[in-house]
Amino acid sequence: MYKKYLIASSFLAAMLLGAVTIPNILYDPWWYFNGNILDQVNPYFNERETKINLFLKSPQKYDCLILGSSRVTFLAARYINGYSCFNMAVSASVGQVGELYYFGRYFNKYSSVPKLLIVGVEEFNFQGPPSTNIPEFVRQLKKPPPWYSRYISLEAIEFTHKVANKNSKSRKSPRVYNQNFEAVFNTNKRLSIDKQVKVIAENIEGCNYLKPIRLGKNFSPDNIKYYKKLIAEFPSARTIGFVPPISVDRLFEIYLLGTLEGYLNNIYETAELFDVFFDFSLPSTITNDGDLTYDGSHFSSATYEKIGKILTKKAGAEVLAVDIKSMGYEQYKQLILMRLESQEFISEYHKRCERIIGI
């Protein structure tokens, strides 16, 4: 009798365990396996963990690391020819630069000898104290929890539900990952670039933008040392830094708030640490095109494919980017100012602003 009870109990326990773990494996919210194999849409939850799980599936095949914020997630590894890159860029808060060193060190421990380091350098990393919002196992250079310990948890059920439910907030995010774990625009939701212009107009009280009118939050050089610390982890690698594109509206806001000088100073000083450095935030046919971005901060995969070619081949850099390493600071500053202060740009921006805020 007892033996039958034990068999029945074991069978029931196995059934319950399977009912919990099988959906979690099929939707794979923590990217231990192949991600969501049912409809190939992978929302992001905690990229600081999921990307480590993805990386550790075959760490020795990588000789190149890409780091940065959520903007840089659109720089797919295949856009960098001649290397086997892993994109470890993650969604960021102010001061995310403090995390880069730890992810770089972790990559060095488990990968092959790195030959190339690519880093996105973003304006918000000069506006706050460094963040260290990283998993403890990354800090300690250890492996993450095994999949079977995660996928029998209630937390895993919750995340699996968010992946499976096409109406969930996570599935409707404007940025998701595809079946190849490449960040892509989510066609279920596209925000309007006009929203950023409206925010700027409200912040600086109108559309009559002819000169800086008030001092905004300045940019501090204090965090530059963290880029230096990161680069020191890659003594034999070629290092490429770049400023990701941001809507010209965002750069114009920095200009109007009187903090452009501090912004450019920090970018230029950081650029000196890298072997190669490009600034894609200048006014250009990319940053002035609202169809290429859903919020003025995140640009399309097609845009980053062009960026990848410029970073490795310098093809087309003259129009879309500034090769900061090839010029002095004053030349760099004057180039940016010339584009921002052109009458054509100001007139067009003025008309667009008035249309958006309804003047």
Show the residue positions of the predicted features.
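Active-site segments of SGNH/GDSL-like serine hydrolases
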Residues: 231-255
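Alpha-helical transmembrane signal-anchor/signal-peptide segments
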Residues: 26-50
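C-terminal regions of proteins
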Residues: 251, 265-359
